[in-house]
């Protein structure tokens, strides 16, 4: 049941994040890395949870922009297949995406998410690690990593991954809750 709840949270973040971006238009004529840097700076400083969610949504919207109409279309198809629980179909699209555009972090992250949904944790972790090599601030990948580590009984390392996510996105409620829970559990074990 907890696995299903975590999966629902991850899917909700991934699918609805672009909707938050609609609230706040991006600055005109700024490069994608500059936009992301500015958004991450704002996200780290923001102390209002709802405002932070909007900024995170803008970051997700930037991550979704591959720079290729074909890749963007395949991402949409893979998302639709995932929503319909057609994970093999989603993986087919995502395999093509990471082959055609290996420097696109969100392609790797989405493939990691599908592997997670299929409980292929080793493959998911490999894709998460690739995502984080390309975008070390990817709070979605960090929380995905933490969820897998927690699920597989590696609570200390999971706590570290959640703390890394909070260093990027301090107002992320899910990560705050998990840090509190894991810290309490580990304190009870006498780490």
Residues covered by each model-derived region:
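N-terminal leader/linker segments that initiate helical-solenoid repeat arrays
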Residues: 2, 19-72
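Residue-level signature for tetratricopeptide repeat
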Residues: 42-45, 80, 114, 148, ...
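TPR/TPR-like (Sel1-like) alpha-helical repeat modules
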Residues: 43-45, 153-174, 180-184
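Alpha-helical linker/edge segments of TPR/alpha-solenoid repeat scaffolds
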Residues: 48, 64-71, 155-160, 182-191
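Conserved structural position within tetratricopeptide repeats
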Residues: 61-64, 98-99, 130-133, 166-167, ...
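Alpha-helical adaptor scaffolds
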Residues: 68-140
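Register position in tetratricopeptide repeats
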Residues: 83, 117, 151-152, 184-188
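Residue-level signature of tetratricopeptide-repeat
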Residues: 111-112, 145, 179
